[in-house]
Amino acid sequence: MPVLEIDKEYLYSLLGMRLSRDELVEILEDTKVNIEGFSDESIELEITSDRLDLLSTEGIARMIKGIIGKELGIPKYPVEHREEELVVDESVKNVRPFAVGAILLDVRLNDSVIKSIIQCQEKIHETLGRKRRRVAIGIHDLDAVKPPFRYIARPMDEVKFIPLGENREMTAREILENTEKGREYGNLIRNEEGLVPLIEDSMGRVMSMPPVINSELTRLSERTRNLFIDVTGTDEKSIRTSLSILVHSIAETG
């Protein structure tokens, strides 16, 4: 089962209050999480498979607020359905067939929020995602690109972009052969046609090559205010559940 590392100061900021060690332990021991570690700075919690909504610090904060009576009931967030924002092309059918997306506006990111979002993303990859085989998530700076977006498969030698963490443009083949993420996850999209799945913006710029790596183009920073999230995979129910978990977690940041 996944183990989540909780930054206590960030947790307190989400709660809007501080709790003593004894109070936190008492609350957590009455829930479906197991305390694996507890220090002055952080808490390590093992999350059970039936509470994947707790795969983030924000999810833990939401649960605690309900237990202590600070916020009761199911949280409600303003939602606008914009189906035109992500078009799924027929070419991905035999590569990695399903994709969903969401846009989140006016998000306030700082180091703690970014770390928490990325941790939630990776925990989803490990659990529901089956190490990205079933589900993979990309999180992008919306203001760096132009919607609508397209999920499409193209020949790997015709695809070029700067992968996240690199400083030069590479072909998709080079990324799969020469980068750490490419070697680790490239086997998940290998096919006889030599196609790779891509998320592109309306100008044809590559945002990600799921489930392998994002583009440097949409890297998150503390200046990022608007997000686009893509979730791709081989099981439609799992990608929708994963998107819901992550979007609700980010919404809790305010």
Cite the ranges covered by each PLM segment.
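RNA/tRNA-interacting regions in translation and RNA-turnover enzymes
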Residues: M1-G254
